[in-house]
A protein has these predicted regions:
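Flexible helix-coil transition and linker loops at the boundaries of alpha-helical arrays
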Residues: 3-7, 25, 41-47, 78-88, ...
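N-terminal alpha-helical interaction modules that lie
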Residues: 1-47, 149-151, 155-156, 169-191
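TPR/TPR-like alpha-solenoid repeats
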Residues: 60, 98, 136, 171-175
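Soluble non-cytosolic domains of exported or imported proteins
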Residues: 30-34, 48, 64, 68, ...
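Elongated scaffolding segments in large macromolecular assemblies
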Residues: 123-154, 162-166
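Hydrophobic/aromatic side-chain positions at a characteristic register within alpha-helices
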Residues: 28, 62-65, 100-101, 135-139, ...
Length: 191
């Protein structure tokens, strides 16, 4: 391990142990999140071959911070993902999960999922990760947009496997059925 890698890991370990200072245990929500984000940023710059900072940002701090601070950590992950997408897609996929389920921000989740789909090499990233955008569109009752996206992915060669196409087609069909049921329920409740 080189000197830069050792310094990067030491910085990450310092940040990771930030909740135990001089014998006092702090609650994560009480942390100085902007300072932690700066430490993680510096550690990622010092040791760019490590994803440890991105793991801490997406798995630890983004899940525990307030919404505004969580977005700072997720943006850090997204920025570093764009530099090495095929190596860092795992952390962006978790950022998508946090944006969707912790922040309840489907637009941010779709933004990240679009980056994941557009910037990664299909040969190096699992299909499920590259399909997240389609699933998010279906979940948001945007089946037509999801259908157009699947057609574009098919035309561009991003979908080459028949089973993958069948899975996406089935998911689109389920999404349309759910959307139809929701529309009927709204109509009935508005009467």
């Amino acid at each position: 391990m080189g000197e830069r890698a050792a310094v990067g890991y030491a910085m990450n370990l310092y940040v990771q142990s930030f909740d135990a200072q001089a014998g006092a245990v702090l609650k994560m929500r009480e942390f100085d999140h902007p300072a932690i984000a700066q430490w993680l940023e510096r550690a990622a710059q010092v040791n760019p071959s490590s994803s440890y900072s991105l793991m801490l940002a997406s798995r630890v701090f983004a899940e525990m911070a307030s919404d505004a601070n969580s977005r700072v950590f997720l943006d850090l992950v997204h920025r570093h993902f764009t530099a090495r997408p095929n190596e860092r897609w795992v952390w962006l996929s978790h950022a998508i999960f946090v944006a969707r389920h912790f922040l309840q921000d489907p637009e941010l989740a779709r933004h990240y999922s679009r980056s994941l789909r557009e910037l990664t090499d299909p040969a190096q990233v699992p299909r499920w990760a590259r399909q997240m955008e389609v699933f998010l569109l279906v979940e948001q009752n945007q089946a037509q947009a999801a259908q157009l996206l699947v057609a574009a992915m098919l035309q561009s060669g991003q979908i080459a496997d028949q089973q993958e196409l069948e899975l996406l087609t089935q998911r689109l069909s389920e999404g349309r059925s759910q959307g139809d049921r929701r529309s009927q329920e709204k109509t009935l409740t508005s009467r």
